[in-house]
């Protein structure tokens, strides 16, 4: 099994992306993963080796590295309400991703390897959310609502409503700016829009994800 990535598609012209969508890698990472994809496919076709590519869209869990945006959001917001951090800086708030849970995706990887014939599969939920939506959902667990003002690098998230009063930090109050945008966190050649179509996996593997977006954020 070879773990491919949705980054293979780059700025794809087709949406959602499936196994037949042309690849258009936009970063050194994606280019290296495309090489691995084709090596597996070539060896399978030439030497009849049982090898499969799983094209995984974004998958998260409690063990996700803290440098990734989802963990950066959840850890940063936790520090804010504990008074350990004053503000959370992020990049593109409108980047769109197809987020699933690693547990569901690991199950599909197992199913891929139980088939009689090797093949390649997209692993995705088919549901898309923005970084901004992830922030709002994470804040809902603290009873905090945001309003946004400004545009681009001047955009900021300000507390508009609080429904819980269990914060150690006295800075958590209506009108407090807690989210800011920084050019430091805009990646070069960032892919702004990814959405997967796992129809083939649902049909051939009888696979379906169980953990939705709201539960994923909660976990």
What are these regions (language model features)?
Residues 1-5, 54-56:
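SDR active-site strand-loop-helix element
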Residues 3-4, 17, 181, 196:
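A conserved hydrophobic position in a structured secondary element of the catalytic/binding core
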Residues 5-7, 13, 94, 198:
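Short, small-residue-rich loop/turn micro-motifs
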Residues 7, 58, 129:
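PG/GG-rich flexible active-site loop of Rossmann-like NAD(P)H-dependent oxidoreductases
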Residues 7-53, 61-64:
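Catalytic helix-loop patch of NAD(P)-dependent Rossmann-fold dehydrogenases
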């Amino acid at each position: 099994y070879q773990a491919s990535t949705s980054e293979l598609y780059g700025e794809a012209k087709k949406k959602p992306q499936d196994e037949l969508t042309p690849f258009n890698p936009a970063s050194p990472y994606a280019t290296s993963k495309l090489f691995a994809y084709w090596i597996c496919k070539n060896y399978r076709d030439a030497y009849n080796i049982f090898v499969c590519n799983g094209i995984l869209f974004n998958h998260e869990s409690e063990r996700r590295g803290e440098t990734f945006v989802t963990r950066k959001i959840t850890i940063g917001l936790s520090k804010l309400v504990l008074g350990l951090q004053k503000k959370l800086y992020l990049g593109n708030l409108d980047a769109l991703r197809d987020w699933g849970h690693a547990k569901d995706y690991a199950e599909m990887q197992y199913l891929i390897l139980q088939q009689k014939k090797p093949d390649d599969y997209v692993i995705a939920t088919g549901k898309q959310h923005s970084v901004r939506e992830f922030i709002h959902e994470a804040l809902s667990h603290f009873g905090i609502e945001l309003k946004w003002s400004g545009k681009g690098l001047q955009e900021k998230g300000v507390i508009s409503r609080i429904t819980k009063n269990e914060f150690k930090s006295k800075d958590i109050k209506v009108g407090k700016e807690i989210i800011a945008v920084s050019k430091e966190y805009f990646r070069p050649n960032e892919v702004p829009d990814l959405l997967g179509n796992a129809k083939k996996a649902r049909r051939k593997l009888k696979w379906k994800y169980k953990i939705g977006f709201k539960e994923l954020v909660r976990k």
